[in-house]
Amino acid sequence: MSGAPIRVVGTLGTAQTLAWASSYYLPAMLADPIARDLGVSAPTVYAAFSIAMVASALVGPWAGQAIDRRGGRIVLVSTSLLFASGLGMLAAAQGLWTMVAAWLVMGAAMGSGLYEAAFSSLVRLYGHHARGAITGITLIAGFASTVGWPLSSWMEAQFGWRGACLGWAGLHLVVGLPLNAWLPKAAAVSKPEIPSASNNAHVQSSPPASEPKQQVYATALLAFVFAATWFISTAMATHLPRMLEATGATLTAAVAVGALIGPAQVAGRLLEFGFLRQVHPLLSARLAALAHPAGVAVLLTGGPAMAPVFAILHGAGNGILTIAKGTLPLALFGPQGYGARQGWLMMPARVAQAASPFLFGLALDSWGANALWLSGGIGSAAFGALVVLRARSTAN
């Protein structure tokens, strides 16, 4: 695992599976019963979830800086407690505002306990050798929806949605917390650094505007790439069946095609682990960024018969890009100050993720299948940004 023990990858990957299954993938199974019980609409529940995503964006830089200073173990252990608290609050919610408060706590947990925190923890432990471990984490946690959706559905059927939330909270306390506590302890540092041309620019409590212009430019490009690709990923996750129906596919076919995306994501990550890890992450990111626009072109040209090709291209590209969000900043900027930088890089992405379901839904309502030109255009812009980023990196 490129310098990281398999035990660490397995431990953190399992904890990440639990974290994703009980947060990001929770509304898909519980939004409707929560809405019925609290007397609100399902879109209101999703709006509260979007607020949680914005909260996670605000927490991310702080969590990253804490990991840079103290290592990931203490942050991730604290996050297990936050997840349990948020889920417990959600289980006890009696109305709109108590539900929103619960999702705000969940947002704080997500901002300090999902992939960005896990990647930062690995980089803090293993530095430049963390790439293989980052890939391994995503391979394991890529099954979060496969585990989370059936388990949430079963717990809701057996114990109600409140019991399901309490069940997830209990799992964080008896499984997630011990797993995170099992991570190696990183040596504390007094003040983490973000590498610069002189290698002495310190992490600030604001975006790294004091860095040399080249690094500021590269950081802005990466932030755009991550925001663009998160927008696409969330839009497809939310609207894929309806979008495929707009191209002429039947509902049955759309659901069947949607089932291809998960395996395609895993296949993409295996491709990264087996072959693309030998090349610079910029190359694998560029190939992955092209996958969605290529799938859009195939689907709009060939019609619903080409929907499986679209799903495979989109899924594989998305799987590789998930890894690139961890490996690309490491390759471009190095391990110093990685956590804080990752927090700032992902802040626009989390906001885009929160807005994506609503904005792409509007486009789909207004334009039908032609809304794919929007996602394809955004994906092409992300590819272009990666090309420019490579050119500038090579030039210097």
What spans do the regions from the language model cover?
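C-terminal transmembrane helical hairpin of 12-TM major facilitator-type secondary transporters
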Residues: A259-Q265, V279-L328
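A late C-terminal transmembrane helix in Major Facilitator Superfamily
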Residues: S145, P335-W367
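Helix-loop-helix hairpin linking two adjacent transmembrane segments in secondary transporters
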Residues: I137-A188
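Extracytoplasmic gate region of multi-pass secondary transporters
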Residues: P27-A31, Q215-A267
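Intracellular juxtamembrane helix-capping segments at the cytosolic ends
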Residues: S112-Y126, I320-F333
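Helix-to-loop junctions at the C-terminal end of transmembrane segments
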Residues: V59-G71, G268-P281, L364-D365
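Conserved MFS/SLC helix-loop-helix module at the cytosolic interface between two early adjacent transmembrane helices
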Residues: L58-L96
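Extracytoplasmic
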Residues: R7-A42, V59-A63, W149, T234-P241
